[in-house]
């Protein structure tokens, strides 16, 4: 089974914020496969499960708020006995320009509180799909920035990148990670 986690904060107030780009992306990917999410209280998340191209897949959106995402991840990972190489986390990254996508396995959390939470519970040896949200301008507070909405042009750029990830997601299901990495650049 493949586990795909989209990071974000629950609630309508956060729905289109920069920090919720993981939720936005995972919903777009799930929609591509005509899946919908349902709440699973025992996992502290919203979940969509399917078999796609003979591959079991589980998409989750933790409902624990960003800083506690690891609690949801460990519950699902343990329940389904999923290995690290089959765990993919989609998240915002302020160190990448808006709309830029990078894929990597393992590494530092870069100060991202959702990744810190996951790392503290399961370690850092999982896959990451990083979506650039850019850095704040004019010494703007980072916390305020990540919780702000995109401008219309920024949102359009980010959605084009997310569509690129969704359109190439089948490569992950086929275990073609190098090809996926090259296609999403």
Curated annotation (Swiss-Prot):
TRNA binds at residues 14, 65, 67, 113. It comes from the Bacteria. This is Peptidyl-tRNA hydrolase. Belongs to the PTH family. One of its GO terms (biological process) is rescue of stalled ribosome. Gene3D superfamilies: Peptidyl-tRNA hydrolase. GO terms for molecular function: peptidyl-tRNA hydrolase activity; tRNA binding. The active site is at residue 19. The record marks 9 as: Discriminates between blocked and unblocked aminoacyl-tRNA. Its EC number is 3.1.1.29. Hydrolyzes ribosome-free peptidyl-tRNAs (with 1 or more amino acids incorporated), which drop off the ribosome during protein synthesis, or as a result of ribosome stalling. Catalyzes the release of premature peptidyl moieties from peptidyl-tRNA molecules trapped in stalled 50S ribosomal subunits, and thus maintains levels of free tRNAs and 50S ribosomes. The keyword NAD does not apply. Monomer. NCBIfam families: pth. Signal peptide: none annotated. GO terms for cellular component: cytoplasm.
């Amino acid at each position: 089974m493949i586990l795909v986690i989209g990071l974000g904060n629950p609630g309508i107030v956060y729905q289109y914020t920069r920090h919720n780009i993981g939720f936005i992306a995972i919903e777009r990917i799930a929609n591509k496969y005509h899946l919908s999410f349902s709440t699973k209280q025992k996992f502290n998340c919203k979940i969509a499960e399917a078999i796609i191209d003979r591959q079991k897949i589980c998409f989750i959106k933790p409902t624990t708020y960003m800083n506690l995402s690891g609690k949801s991840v460990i519950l699902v990972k343990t329940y389904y006995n999923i290995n690290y190489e089959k765990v993919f986390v989609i998240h915002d990254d302020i160190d990448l320009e808006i709309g830029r996508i990078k894929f990597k396995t393992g590494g530092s959390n870069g100060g991202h509180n959702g990744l810190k939470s996951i790392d503290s519970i399961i370690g850092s040896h999982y896959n990451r799909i990083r979506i650039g949200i850019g850095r704040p301008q004019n010494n703007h507070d980072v916390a305020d920035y990540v919780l702000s909405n995109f401008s219309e042009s920024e949102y359009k750029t980010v959605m084009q990148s997310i569509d690129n990830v969704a359109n190439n997601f089948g490569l992950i299901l086929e275990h073609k990670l190098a090809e996926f990495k090259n296609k999403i650049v």
